[in-house]
């Protein structure tokens, strides 16, 4: 998993971040019948018409650039600071395509037809992977895309992270590319061979690692100055000089269209204008594009907006071709449709959860939350369908574990679509009572039977311990507060006292995370926190989040079975290992998993193309080369 921990305002509750996260209007959730499981899946909002037949016309397509998402980086070797879906998917990948393309409509899976290479071939006990580049891809200056361009990217990645690991966003120290690669060979112009230091899971390496490789034009970029000679980039000192030159050029936003570096592309579009102040830009088709579908739209124009309100006003006025529907405007969908737009929403492939702190000793919470029945009881108090109806305006999908119920992926286990702990206050009370707690629905439950035997509270929980603890949550967007307020209310109905405490996202991740950033004091007196969530890669292992030593394991969850399953997902050869990992974590509840909100895309009814090319907008992918006007 290439995990991107995010403020909910950026990724977790809205996929696109600021684009959707204006808080929806308040209101209590509409409850399902207590104790009645439901396997009905939500997710889709609106519909996509079939591709129009008949004459196909050209014209300028304008699309809405959400607030705060203006491109700040152009080099396809992306720094951590610029490692965002908007910067990469909507901007860079229109010009430079990754080795393997992922995103097939709403499904987070590989799209072979849009990949620069054929499927990789594994050998040597899953320690060697051979890749054959497709012959159709050429750079815009007519030169072919070769194995040397892949090697160039790899050597520049090594040079970048040698200076600072933050210079490449996908980098995980000791893991994957480049640290686990012993050698890269280019036996032919179309063949690249990666030899690894240890056997890996092929699915993980393809989805998480090879998908981040973006061939770069060595014949045009392997230099250290504008007029300097081409250098041997395989020499580390030269690679460093080249990286410093390219990264400096990437920081010069006002030269994006004048610098000849950025005109050498292999994607469907080239950059024709860029406003460094506003982030507005235009693109035109690359006539040398060797992909499966040449662009029909002659001009793609990104129109920046300073607020969701301004963007929605443009949609309502019909002045933008492709945009989005902010969550707080979901109820105005009929107005949007009457303004001449198609509307379709779907959840992104990510997971949100409330973190449990397994190390918080306040009130013996560490011992309380270590009991599986406690985590199961809390899960029974969350009304996912009610949240989707009341807080998401119906635009959302269930998620009961680290792999959401929707969208489905090749790695979605069968049990991901069924809630193992359906909303039921009665079931929560039953679990607590059967484990030695005295229930007080007008106050706070207490442990009546201390001990580790059947019907007792569990190890380290003294008699008389109250079932009371705090929950720290992010103030933005307001939808988080609505969810945790409802949870606290339902918990009170079962005699569980949850003290809510709000804070801003940056404060939470600075002072309440574990491990804490260097030089910051760590506040460990929190039982639960809701800061947002994680964006899944297409290979959805939770490595780094729920394994014991994970760098993003804020709650110190450490389960030997989970550790073994997560490890097998990455280094084992079992293609279904990640399914077993997800199934166990869904049952074991290392955190309280929450439903996912839809990203709702809108586009003019006279703009058409394959349904998948519009569905993929909900996953923050952009494939305008497939579009055309019908009128």
Positions of predicted regions on the chain:
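Ligand-site clamp/hinge motif
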Residues: 257-260, 280-333, 497
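Append "and occasionally in soluble cytosolic enzymes with long acidic Gly/Pro-rich linkers
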Residues: 282-287, 369-489
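Gly/Pro-rich hinge or "lid" segments in bacterial periplasmic/extracellular proteins
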Residues: 105, 213-294, 430
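N-terminal lobe/hinge region of extracytoplasmic solute-binding protein
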Residues: 61-124, 264
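Surface-exposed binding/hinge segments that line
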Residues: 56, 170-246
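Long beta-strand-rich cores associated with HINT superfamily self-processing modules
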Residues: 37-39, 603-631
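Aromatic- and charge-enriched surface segment that lines or borders ligand/interaction sites
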Residues: 118-165, 187, 193-195, 311-314, ...
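Extracytoplasmic/peripheral linker and loop segments enriched in polar/acidic and small residues
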Residues: 48-54, 376, 388, 497-520, ...
């Amino acid at each position: 998993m290439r995990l991107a921990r995010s403020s909910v305002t950026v990724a977790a509750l809205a996929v696109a971040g600021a684009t959707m996260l204006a808080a929806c209007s308040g209101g209590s959730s509409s409850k399902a019948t207590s104790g009645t499981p439901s396997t009905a899946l939500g997710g889709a909002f609106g519909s996509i018409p079939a591709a129009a037949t008949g004459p196909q016309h050209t014209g300028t397509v304008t699309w809405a650039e959400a607030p705060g998402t203006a491109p700040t980086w152009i080099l396809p070797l992306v720094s951590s600071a610029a490692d965002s879906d908007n910067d990469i998917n909507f901007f860079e990948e229109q010009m430079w395509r990754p080795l393997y393309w992922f995103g097939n409509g709403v499904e987070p899976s590989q799209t072979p037809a849009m990949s620069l290479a054929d499927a990789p071939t594994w050998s040597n006990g899953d320690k060697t992977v051979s890749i054959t580049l497709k012959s159709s891809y050429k750079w815009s200056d007519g030169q072919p895309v070769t194995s040397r361009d892949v090697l160039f990217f790899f050597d520049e990645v090594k040079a970048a992270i040698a200076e600072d690991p933050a210079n490449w966003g996908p980098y995980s120290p000791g893991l994957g590319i480049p640290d686990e690669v012993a050698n890269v060979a280019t036996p032919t112009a179309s063949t690249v061979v990666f030899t690894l230091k240890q056997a890996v899971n092929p699915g993980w390496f393809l989805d998480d690692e090879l998908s981040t490789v973006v061939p770069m034009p060595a014949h045009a970029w392997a230099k250290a100055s504008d007029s300097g000679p081409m250098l041997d980039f395989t020499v580390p000192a030269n690679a460093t000089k080249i990286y410093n030159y390219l990264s400096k050029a990437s920081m010069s936003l006002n030269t994006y269209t004048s610098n000849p570096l950025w005109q050498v592309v292999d994607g469907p579009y080239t950059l024709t204008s860029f406003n460094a102040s506003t982030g507005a830009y235009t693109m035109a088709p690359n006539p040398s594009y060797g992909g499966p579908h040449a662009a029909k739209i002659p001009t793609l124009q990104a129109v920046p907006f300073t607020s969701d309100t301004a963007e929605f006003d443009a949609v309502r006025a019909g002045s933008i071709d492709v945009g989005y529907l902010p969550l707080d405007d979901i109820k105005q969908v009929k107005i949007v449709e009457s303004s001449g737009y198609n509307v379709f929403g779907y959840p992104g492939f990510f997971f949100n959860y409330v973190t449990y702190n397994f190390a918080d000793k306040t009130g013996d919470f560490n011992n309380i939350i270590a009991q599986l029945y406690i985590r199961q009881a809390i899960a029974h108090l969350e009304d996912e369908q009610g949240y989707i109806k009341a807080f998401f305006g119906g635009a959302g999908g269930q998620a009961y574990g680290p792999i959401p119920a929707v969208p489905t992926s090749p790695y979605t286990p069968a049990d991901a679509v069924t809630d193992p702990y359906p909303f039921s206050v009665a079931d929560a009370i039953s679990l607590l009572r059967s484990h030695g707690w005295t229930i007080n629905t007008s106050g706070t439950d207490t442990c009546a039977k201390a001990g580790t035997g059947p019907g007792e509270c569990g190890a380290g929980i003294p008699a008389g311990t109250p079932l009371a603890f705090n929950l720290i949550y992010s103030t933005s967007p307001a939808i988080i507060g609505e969810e945790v307020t409802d949870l606290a209310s339902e918990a009170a109905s079962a005699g569980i006292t949850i003290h809510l405490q709000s804070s801003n996202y940056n404060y939470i991740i600075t002072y309440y995370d574990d491990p804490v950033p260097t030089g910051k004091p760590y506040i460990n007196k929190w039982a639960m926190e809701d800061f947002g969530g994680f964006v899944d890669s297409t290979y959805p292992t939770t490595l780094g989040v729920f394994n014991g030593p994970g760098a993003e394991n804020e709650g110190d969850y450490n389960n030997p079975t989970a550790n073994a399953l997560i490890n097998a997902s990455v280094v084992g050869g079992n293609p279904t290992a990640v399914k077993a990992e997800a199934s166990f974590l869904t049952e074991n509840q290392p955190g309280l998993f929450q439903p996912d909100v839809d990203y709702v895309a809108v586009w003019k009814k006279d703009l058409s193309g394959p349904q998948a090319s519009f569905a993929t907008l909900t996953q923050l992918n952009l494939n305008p080369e497939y579009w055309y006007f019908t009128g």
